[in-house]
């Protein structure tokens, strides 16, 4: 995959890129406003395989903002088995009337390289497969300037 790329839906499917990164990463951080069962179903096999790898760490931050996130989707994520020191953390931002609407997918590889996708896709089948969504991908090499830390690390 190129160092930078825009995924716009149509022939540029975001789901395949997410599966590829999740399948290779040692650490995954997602911040998505809405988590739907349809999106969890699409990523569950890849997440399940990732959580079988020793030391894998998956963090997902979502919200109760607007009541869109589906409780059954969160339950399905928490039900995924993790072994060999792997773990899945799930956090929910309590909106309390404030907007919480990020869509960021961050991956760190064993080499130290990091890939970030930032855009408009929530964790839903429509957003990941065929919706009109824009998601920008950027690869930061292991020896590159660390751009993905600071606020993202604090948030996720």
Role assignments for model-derived ranges:
Residues 1-156:
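PLD/PLD-like phosphodiesterase catalytic module centered on the HKD motif
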């Amino acid at each position: 995959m190129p160092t930078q790329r825009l995924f716009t839906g149509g022939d540029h499917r975001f789901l395949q890129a997410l599966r590829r990164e999740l399948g290779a990463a040692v650490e995954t951080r997602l911040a998505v406003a809405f988590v739907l069962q349809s999106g969890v179903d699409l990523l569950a096999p890849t997440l399940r395989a990732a959580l079988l790898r020793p030391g894998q760490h998956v963090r997902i931050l979502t919200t109760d903002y607007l009541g869109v996130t589906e409780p059954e989707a969160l339950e399905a994520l928490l039900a995924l088995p993790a072994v060999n020191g792997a773990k899945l953390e799930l956090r929910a931002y309590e909106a309390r009337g404030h907007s919480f609407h990020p869509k960021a997918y961050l991956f760190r590889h064993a080499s130290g390289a990091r890939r970030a996708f930032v855009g408009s896709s929530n964790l839903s089948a429509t957003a990941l497969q065929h919706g009109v969504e824009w998601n920008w991908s950027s690869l930061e090499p292991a020896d590159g300037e660390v751009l993905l830390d600071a606020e993202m690390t604090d948030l996720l």
